[in-house]
Each structure stands twice: as C-alpha cells, then as structure tokens.
Amino acid sequence: MLKLFLNAGFYILLFVSCNKTDANTDPSSTGSVIADPKAIEVLFIGNSLTYTNDLPALLTNHAKSRQILIRTSTIAFPNYALLDHLSENNITMAMSKTKFKYIIVQQGPSSQAEGRAWLIEGATKLKALANKNGASLCIFMVWPAYSNYSNFDGVIKNHTDAASMTNSILCPVGMAWKEYIDRTNDLSYYGPDLFHPSPKGSQVAAEIIFKSLFK
C-alpha cells in the first residue's frame, strides 16, 4: 500500500550482494564495492517481500551455482509500493552510479483495483526509466497472505497484465507458489506470519527469477 508517512526509524535498505571472491568491500563504507567487471548488474526495488531472507543474495548464489556471475543492489522499505519509491530519488541515484542490466520490481499482492492501478502506473514509469538507462524491467509477481488466498487469481492476473502492458519480463513466482500449494496443500513456502516467505519460499522465488532472466 502507499505509505502515508516515513517514520524516522525507517531507512533505505541499499546493499550489494556478491560472493567475497567476486568483490572487495570497505567495511567502513556502506555499498562501497569494487565489482568484477564481468558481473551482470541487477537492481531490486521492493519491500519486505524482497528483503526477507535476503532474496537478492539467494539469487546471486543460485546464479553462481549455474556459472553466472551477478551483482545485486537492493532498494527496499517496509510496505512500499512502486509509486512510493518513485516519489524519492534513490532509484535515479542508483542508476546514475551503476549500469544495470535488469531492474526487478516488486509491490504487494495488488489483487484489488487500487493496487492494480498503482502497480501498472509504477511499472509504466519504471519501464521508462529502465529504457532510458538501457536496462530490462522485470515484474516480480508475489502472492497474497494466506488469509486472502481467494485473491490469488487477481494477484496473478494483475502482475501478468502489468508485465504485458509495459513489455517487461514477468517473473511468475506467485503463479508457481499457487500451483504448488494447490497440488500439495503444503504451506511451507509461507513463513510464520503466513504472508512473508519462509527460506524455502524465498529460494523458490530466486530460482524462478533466475529462470525468467536467463532463459
């Protein structure tokens, strides 16, 4: 949902995920990294569904297991919609410093009309930014809280539409979650609050995102 205010205790989660053999870090400087020039740069933009279990690091590690070197940066706040990110300058600052190949964007479930509108408007604006910077926009399809499981089809449709309308790459994580849960009645992709992902759920997300990017 769109934020109404930014509590002083909130902060941007902007970090780089890479294997220690791939980069040298200065511990006194957040995000100061000398990257392997062969690494594929990936920017994640989202909220707690992205930073729970450190999804960017899981993607980095999964890619490395497939002999692909990537370097991820993340901009994420609790409860942020894409339009919240666009109202600030963190994205443009990140793009001014790094040539990203992929920009992976994530909003909440967005199953209802208002969330759908925010998702499509945000994706449209971010697509323009991605195009301007020579990057491919990727829509990370999430999932609803289990208490709203009946809204899952709306989540899938609205993310699919957002990707289609913006000619972006769809990362159909939510679709895979639903297929698995419907088939097995196993809720282990969900964490204890039955909304945020478990480590298993985040690992599945990383693998699906990888397949979507590197078909």
Report the location of each language-model feature.
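Bacterial Sec-dependent N-terminal signal peptides
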Residues: 16-38
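Positively charged n-region of N-terminal signal peptides that target proteins for export
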Residues: 1-4, 19
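Active-site catalytic microenvironments for nucleophilic, acid-base chemistry
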Residues: 62-65, 208-215
